[in-house]
C-alpha cells in the first residue's frame, strides 16, 4: 500500500532571468485581475512568490496562463436593471490558508442588483485562532466596504 503523504512542492528557486520573467508575467496577471474576478485569488497567491519565485510558483503561473487561453472570451456583461436594486455583500475566508505564516485569506464581493461594484481577495493581517474568528474578520471587512 502506498504512502498518503502530500506531494512535495518543488522549492528550487528560479534563475535570475527566469525570476525577472516570472515577476513581469505575474504583474501583468495582477493588472488583468482588476477586471476578472475569476482569477483574482489565483493571482494573489502567485504574487506571494514575487520575492523568491520557485519552480512550484512557475508551474502555477503556467497553469493560470493555460486557463486564460482556454477562457479568453470571458466578459462581464452589464444589463439595464428596470427595478430598484439593493446593495448586497458576500464574504468568505480560508482559515490558515498561508502555510508559512498561518494567516487566513478573506474574499468578498459587493453587488448592486446583478452588477459587481467591488470584489477582493486579501491575506488577513492577523493570525486567527479559529475559522469563526477568520470569518468574523471577513464579515467586518465586507461591512466596512458596504458603508
Predicted regions and their residues:
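Divalent metal-binding acidic/histidine catalytic loops
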Residues: 1-147
Amino acid at each position: 500500500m502506498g504512502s498518503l503523504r502530500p506531494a512535495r512542492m518543488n522549492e528550487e528557486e528560479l534563475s535570475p532571468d527566469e525570476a525577472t520573467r516570472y515577476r513581469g508575467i505575474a504583474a501583468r496577471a495582477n493588472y488583468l485581475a482588476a477586471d476578472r474576478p475569476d482569477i483574482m485569488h489565483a493571482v494573489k497567491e502567485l504574487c506571494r512568490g514575487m520575492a523568491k519565485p520557485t519552480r512550484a510558483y512557475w508551474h502555477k503561473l503556467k497553469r493560470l496562463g493555460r486557463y486564460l487561453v482556454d477562457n479568453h472570451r470571458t466578459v462581464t456583461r452589464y444589463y439595464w436593471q428596470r427595478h430598484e436594486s439593493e446593495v448586497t455583500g458576500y464574504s468568505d475566508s480560508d482559515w490558515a490558508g498561508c502555510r508559512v505564516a498561518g494567516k487566513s485569506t478573506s474574499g468578498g464581493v459587493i453587488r448592486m442588483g446583478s452588477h459587481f461594484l467591488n470584489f477582493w481577495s486579501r491575506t488577513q493581517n492577523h493570525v486567527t485562532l479559529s475559522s469563526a474568528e477568520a470569518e468574523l474578520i471577513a464579515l467586518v471587512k465586507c461591512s466596512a466596504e458596504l458603508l
